[in-house]
């Protein structure tokens, strides 16, 4: 796949602001931005961070071509000096981020940028694009996977995705979230995600008889024979013809691995009937795969109804996150450097949830030592260190009277260095390692946090030092207004 030049994939105001910083001699002022989100999609208890690998690729390749400069000259908005500066533009700052697959919560940084103002401002759009999209799909996929209760979930959404990147990177994110495979072939080629597939109704229709279609497919792919049985009549012909094809082709070869797929109708009822027919024919190991506009709600319902399903194929409602299709990540200035000192900045809003947490920060995840269970996340000023040998008092940053003292704990920093002085210092894990890490980290959360409806709120608290800084800034801004 040839690389695209994504340098100008930015909101236009990133360029006008960058030009403004440059012209006003603010371009080299060191600034700090946090990328975070405010609400978990679908009212869930946590989200899954994804998309960092694409951020890394973008930052590494970031440069303006001659064609880019000519386009910007044509706009007649930018100074000649600024355009000349862009000819040698490279990212020279620092980036910290949570590893992909990490469960994350509202209000905490998924990524922090420290860089000259021009650079930090310009990269905003693409960073949000990467993390918003893939975190959304990884989060949705994980909900679907957890609803399936251990049954494999295949990502089947390419044809309903919103564009090619939506399909390719959506499959990547879905795999991080726990899907077992994808129907998107290029995602296998690019990322090593297992590609899988059965057949379409058109295959069956191309033959004079349904049986001929099934027999031919079994002969061509005897070790991968999953037959689509709902083209005409599932119980009357589809399953009987599948059994006949298995008898005549697979059984003589000693192959027991086979499957059928249901793509329409009452899949709970049909799966029960199909299981009975297959078992009576001796195909107790035959897998029943179902698709047909599934999501976590439908999957939970049909499992409760006793559906006999082994594998779920989930398409449009996963790849588009149909029930809540926006992640809502934002990118906000939190500090600047003045004479080598970090000066915190705050954004104030009439909506309390939109007031930002200022300063260059660390994010600690606090775990119980005995169980390894995550208790809370703690935002601290960058120079704070948690002493694990002493009791730690946590308090709700809004309802400050709610306090908890934890002992016998350990703390883990979530933000890790990705770029230092413009150089990548982080080695991205392969996709299987990311998926494994995601599963392991979700296991550290309380079951109550993982509820689909009305989950227990996982606390993201502020250290005393950070809370006091935030409160002082609020008071000062309030007096100025």
Specify the residue positions occupied by each region the protein language model found:
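Gly/Ser/Thr/Ala-enriched C-terminal appendages of enzymes
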Residues: 1-29, 33, 38, 43-44, ...
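Buried, small/hydrophobic-residue-enriched core segments of structured protein domains
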Residues: 1-31, 39-41, 77, 83-105, ...
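N-terminal, Lys/Arg-enriched amphipathic/low-complexity engagement segments
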Residues: 31-87
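Short coil/turn segments at secondary-structure boundaries
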Residues: 70-71, 139-143, 157, 450-457
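Short, positively charged
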Residues: 75-83, 163, 390-398
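Hydrophobic residues within beta-strands of alpha/beta enzymes
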Residues: 196, 260, 288, 310-312
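Residue-level "edge-of-site" marker
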Residues: 201, 291, 315
């Amino acid at each position: 796949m040839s690389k695209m030049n994504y340098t100008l994939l930015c909101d236009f105001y990133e360029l006008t602001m960058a030009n403004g910083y440059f012209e006003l001699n603010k371009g080299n002022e060191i600034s700090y931005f946090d990328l975070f989100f405010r609400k978990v999609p679908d009212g869930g208890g946590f989200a899954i961070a994804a998309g960092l690998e694409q951020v890394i690729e973008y930052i590494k390749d970031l440069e303006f071509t001659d064609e880019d400069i000519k386009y910007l000259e044509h706009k007649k908005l930018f100074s000649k000096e600024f355009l000349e500066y862009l000819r040698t533009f490279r990212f020279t700052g620092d980036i910290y981020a949570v590893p992909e697959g990490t469960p994350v919560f509202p209000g905490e940084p998924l990524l922090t940028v420290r860089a000259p103002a021009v650079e930090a401002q310009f990269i905003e759009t693409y960073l949000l694009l990467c993390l918003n999209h893939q975190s959304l799909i990884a989060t949705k996929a994980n909900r679907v996977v957890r609803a399936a209760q251990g049954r494999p979930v295949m990502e089947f959404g390419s044809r309903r995705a919103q564009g090619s990147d939506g399909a390719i990177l959506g499959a990547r994110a879905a795999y991080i979230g726990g899907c077992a495979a994808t129907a998107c072939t290029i995602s296998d080629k690019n990322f090593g995600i297992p590609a899988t597939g059965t057949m379409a109704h058109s295959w069956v229709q191309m033959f004079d008889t349904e049986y001929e279609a099934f027999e031919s497919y079994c002969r061509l792919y005897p070790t991968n024979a999953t037959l689509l049985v709902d083209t005409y009549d599932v119980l009357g012909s589809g399953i009987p013809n599948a059994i006949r094809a298995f008898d005549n082709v697979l059984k003589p070869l000693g192959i027991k691995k086979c499957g059928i797929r249901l793509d329409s109708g009452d899949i709970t009822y049909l799966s029960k009937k199909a299981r009975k027919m297959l078992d009576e024919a001796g195909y107790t190991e035959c897998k029943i795969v179902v698709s047909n506009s599934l999501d976590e709600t439908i999957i939970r319902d049909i499992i409760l109804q006793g559906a006999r399903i082994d594998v779920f194929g989930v398409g449009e409602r996963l790849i588009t996150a149909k029930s809540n299709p926006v992640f809502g990540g934002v990118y906000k200035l939190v500090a600047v450097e003045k004479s080598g000192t970090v000066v915190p900045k705050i954004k104030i809003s009439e909506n309390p949830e939109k007031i930002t947490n200022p300063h260059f920060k660390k994010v600690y995840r606090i775990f119980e030592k005995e169980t390894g269970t995550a208790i809370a996340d703690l935002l601290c000023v960058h120079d704070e260190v948690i002493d694990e040998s002493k009791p730690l008092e946590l308090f709700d940053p809004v309802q400050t009277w709610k306090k908890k003292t934890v002992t016998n704990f350990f703390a883990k920093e979530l933000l890790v260095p990705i770029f230092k002085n413009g150089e990548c210092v982080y080695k991205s894990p392969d996709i299987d390692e990311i998926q494994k890490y995601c599963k392991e980290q979700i296991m550290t959360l309380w079951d109550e946090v993982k509820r689909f409806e009305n989950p227990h709120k996982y606390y993201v608290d502020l250290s005393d030092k950070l809370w006091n800084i935030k409160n002082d800034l609020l008071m000062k801004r309030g007096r100025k207004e």
